Swiss-Prot record:
Binding site for Fe cation 2: 48, 78, 144, 183
Names of the cofactor(s): Fe(2+)
Stored Gene3D superfamilies: 3.60.21.10
Keyword Protein biosynthesis: no
Source organism of this protein record: Vesicomyosocius okutanii subsp. Calyptogena okutanii (strain HA)
Family: Belongs to the cyclic nucleotide phosphodiesterase class-III family.
Recorded GO MF terms: 3',5'-cyclic-AMP phosphodiesterase activity; metal ion binding; nucleotide binding
UniProt cofactor note: Binds 2 Fe(2+) ions per subunit.
Entry's EC annotation: 3.1.4.-
Family annotation (Pfam families): Metallophos
UniProt: Fe cation 1 binding residues: 10, 12, 48, 185
Keywords, in A-Z order: Hydrolase, Iron, Metal-binding, Nucleotide-binding
Name used for this protein in its record: Probable cyclic nucleotide phosphodiesterase COSY_0614
Length: 233
C-alpha cells in the first residue's frame, strides 16, 4: 500500500496576522484550502508554526487547521515556544510514527534562544536507539534545520551547526530514504549517499527570489521509492 504525506513549514502565525511583512494568516488559509481537496494520509508541519510562540497564535493556528481532518504530525522550530506548543498540540508532537512499511523519525534540532540548530548528545543517542530498534523497511528523518549547504542566498550559518554528528549516525543505517526539513523558506532537493535531502517552502514567504507560497507533496511507495511534488500558490 502506498501512502501520501504533505509537508508544510514555517507558517509564522502571529497575533496581529502580519509577520515579516506579510499576512501569514491569509497565506496559510490559502494553503489549507488547497490541501483540504487532496486525499492524503498525513500532514507534517516541520516547525515555526508561530512567529513569537504566544498561546493565542497557536490557538489561531489550531482553528485554521480544523478543516483538515487527517493525522497531524508536528515538530518544533526555533520560533516556537515549547510550553505553549505542547499545551495546544500535545497529541500531535511525535518522535516516531509508522505508515505501513515506512517509519518517520523526528529529531529535535532546536536550541533555546538561537536561530541555528544543534543536535545534543542525548538527541543523537535517542536517534541511534530509535534507528536500531526500528522494524520498518524504510525510514524518513525529519527535523527543523537544514543539514546541508543550501547553495542559495540562504545564510548557512543559521542551519544545523553539527551535521557531521548527524550523518555519523545516519550513515550506519541503509533503510533511510530521505531527510525532510524547513527553516530555510525555500524548496530545494539534494542527494547524499543515495539519501534524498529535501527542503520545504514556507507557507508565509520565501527567502529566495520565489514570490509564491507552497508545500511539498510526497508519495511513499511499498518498494521504498519516494516521490516529491512541490506545489505552489
Amino acid at each position: 500500500m502506498n501512502y501520501s504525506l504533505i509537508q508544510i513549514s514555517d507558517c509564522h502565525i502571529d497575533d496581529n496576522k502580519y509577520s515579516m511583512g506579510v499576512n501569514t494568516h491569509i497565506n496559510l488559509k490559502k494553503i489549507i484550502s488547497r490541501i483540504s481537496h487532496i486525499n492524503i494520509d498525513v500532514l507534517l508541519i516541520t516547525g515555526d508554526l508561530t512567529h513569537k510562540g504566544s498561546i493565542t497564535s497557536y490557538k489561531a493556528l489550531q482553528q485554521m487547521l480544523y478543516p483538515i481532518q487527517i493525522k497531524l504530525l508536528i515538530i518544533p522550530g526555533n520560533h516556537d515556544n515549547k510550553n505553549n506548543l505542547s499545551a495546544t498540540f500535545s497529541k500531535n508532537l511525535f518522535s516516531q510514527f509508522t505508515l505501513g512499511k515506512w517509519e518517520i523519525i523526528n529529531i529535535n534540532s532546536v536550541q533555546v534562544s538561537k536561530t541555528s540548530g544543534f543536535l545534543t548528545k542525548d538527541e543523537l543517542i535517542k536517534l541511534e536507539l530509535n534507528l536500531a530498534q526500528s522494524i520498518a523497511q524504510y525510514i524518513l528523518i525529519t527535523l527543523h534545520h537544514p543539514t546541508v549547504p543550501m547553495n542559495s542566498t540562504w545564510d548557512d550559518s543559521l542551519s544545523l551547526e553539527n551535521p557531521e554528528a548527524l550523518f555519523n549516525v545516519l550513515d550506519k543505517y541503509h533503510k533511510i530514504q530521505a531527510i525532510l526539513f524547513g527553516h530555510a523558506h525555500q524548496a530545494a532537493e539534494f542527494k547524499r549517499l543515495g539519501v534524498k535531502i529535501i527542503s520545504c517552502p514556507s507557507t508565509a514567504l520565501q527567502f529566495n527570489n520565489e514570490t509564491r507560497i507552497g508545500f511539498n507533496y510526497y508519495t511513499l511507495y511499498d518498494n521504498g521509492q519516494l516521490t516529491i511534488n512541490t506545489q505552489w500558490i
